[in-house]
Amino acid sequence: MLEALLRQHDKVEQDWAEKDVPKLVDQLLDNYARFGGMDHLEGRDLPSKKVVTEVLEDLFSILFPGYLGDSEITKANIKYHLGLKLTSVYSRLTIEVEKSLKYICRKMECPQDICQKRAHVVVKELLEALPEIRSGLSGDISAAYSGDPAAVSNEEVILSYPCVLAITTYRIAHELYTRGVPVIPRIMTEHMHSLTGIDIHPGAKIGRNFFIDHGTGVVIGETAEIGDNVKLYQGVTLGALSFPKDEKGNIIKGRKRHPTIGNNVVIYSGATLLGGETIIGDNVIIGGNVWVTSSVPAGTRITIAAPEQHYKMENNIEKK
């Protein structure tokens, strides 16, 4: 009985492979032809998301040796570890950056070696910026530790706080973004968005000592500017008020669409700040669930009135 079932299964599998698979292949090819923009069958290779995320993990291990990464780091082997990781990141990331640059140049008659040379320069500059990036991250971690009464130590912050991963990724991706590298910065930040729930566009400009408490649902748009010593809580949106369109109805890109936040600002959970002309002055406190679409002077505290609540008791008597 068992042998008969196995033979029947093998026959069904063979029939499917010989008859149905070719039909399915033809259907998919027809679908590719009718619905463009979802395949990349012609032209140069696109950067590999897998390689980019692996490189990002290696950069974490360089910035936080002994904390993030799968290697056991000691003072005895740290020099070897850094040399190995830097060399590996340089070679792999250069290939991916070159692909991303060629992706932009595919419709232009660029000399073949320009993208390759530019990729080497960009990755070299990123790696040389790591000491400065790390100095900035030190302030971000200190801001998290001092700004959260539940934080026990810097070690706990580095190992467990999602904002550390999100902000670190942003600061790496921002270096590539400002050097004109397409695709890869978004791969990095969207990868971390999927892991942490914190969405920071690599084009945003963020100052020192930045802290996102809890983090889930935070959105920071491409043209947002954030000063020093700023603290955001979960669910804060720094977004666009509207999207101006051209005469054909297409969204006009490249304009400032997101708010500017001054120094020493605290924005509590659920607050929404919209618009490129919205400027929040220094030392402002914005309460939870506040909706802001215009500029706020320095030193202002904004809150919304508490909603009226009604309680119905067991004796059906309503109490306000």
Please identify what each model-predicted range represents.
Residues 1-187, 318-320:
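Terminal amphipathic alpha-helical/low-complexity segments used for targeting or macromolecular assembly
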Residues 193-314:
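Structural signal for interior beta-strand "rungs" in well-ordered beta-sheet cores
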